[in-house]
Each structure stands twice: as structure tokens, then as C-alpha cells.
């Protein structure tokens, strides 16, 4: 809605990989541009300035995680039936929770876009190993 209707929402991405900031932001921009083009929509002028990418939740980069991330995965699956994996979605969900706490966000709606990772969730559960855990 932010880009479609010039809303007041914020678009915040959380990098979970070891990619450099510029490369990661280009990936976000490309995805948004492709979506708008495929749907015959026009991006507002200066839309790129609306993207915010947080790099502080990478936990060492791709495939690296710790017990805090595993705990979030367990909690969300037990509470909400939401399968998260330690490589992608679990790390991103943990980062989102940290971001919300650190920025003291209250009384606002948050949309977490789960981008997949279900097979990795089952690998994590079945193996029950520390995998990439720090």
C-alpha cells in the first residue's frame, strides 16, 4: 500500500545473508520494479527512498544462527503453527522481533512476509542438530 497508494506505512527489509548492503537493496528494488511492471502499475517518483534495509540481524551470514533463533522457531510453531527455518524465515522472524523491541514499536500493525523455507524447517526438526548454530 505504501507504494500503491502513497500510504504512511514503512517498508523495512531485514537482511539475513552476508550480502553487501548495495547488492541487497538492488535485489529489493528489482523485485518491486518487476512486480509493478508485470501488473502494469506505475511506481511513484522517488520510491526507492521508501525502502529501509536493516543489516544488523545477520548473525554471521547465510546459514548461521544461534539458540535464540531456534527458540523463536519453536515458539512460533507451538503457538501459531508457523513453520520457520533457521536459515531464512526463522532468522528473519527473530530479526523482526528484535527490531520491534529495539525500536519500541507499539500499537501498530506489522506484516511479516514468509517467503518459504518449509523444507528447511522439516530438515531442522528431523535432524535436531545444531546445524549452522554458532
Regions found by a protein language model. Give the residues of each.
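Active-site-adjacent helical/loop segments in soluble small-molecule enzymes
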Residues: 47-107
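Short, loop-centered acidic/histidine patches that primarily coordinate divalent metals
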Residues: 87-89, 113-116
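Conserved beta-strand elements of the Class I
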Residues: 109-111
Amino acid at each position: 500500500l505504501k507504494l500503491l497508494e502513497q500510504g504512511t506505512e514503512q517498508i523495512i527489509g531485514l537482511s539475513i545473508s552476508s550480502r553487501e548492503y548495495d547488492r541487497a537493496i538492488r535485489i529489493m528494488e528489482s523485485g518491486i520494479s518487476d512486480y509493478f511492471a508485470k501488473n502494469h502499475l506505475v511506481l511513484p517518483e522517488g520510491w526507492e527512498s521508501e525502502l529501509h534495509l536493516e543489516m544488523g540481524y545477520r548473525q554471521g551470514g547465510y546459514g548461521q544462527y544461534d539458540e535464540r533463533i531456534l527458540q523463536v522457531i519453536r515458539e512460533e510453531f507451538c503457538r501459531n503453527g508457523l513453520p520457520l527455518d533457521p536459515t531464512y524465515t526463522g532468522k528473519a522472524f527473530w530479526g523482526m522481533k528484535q527490531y520491534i523491541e529495539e525500536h519500541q514499536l507499539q500499537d501498530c500493525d506489522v506484516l511479516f512476509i514468509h517467503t518459504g523455507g518449509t523444507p528447511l524447517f522439516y530438515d531442522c526438526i528431523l535432524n535436531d542438530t545444531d546445524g549452522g548454530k554458532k
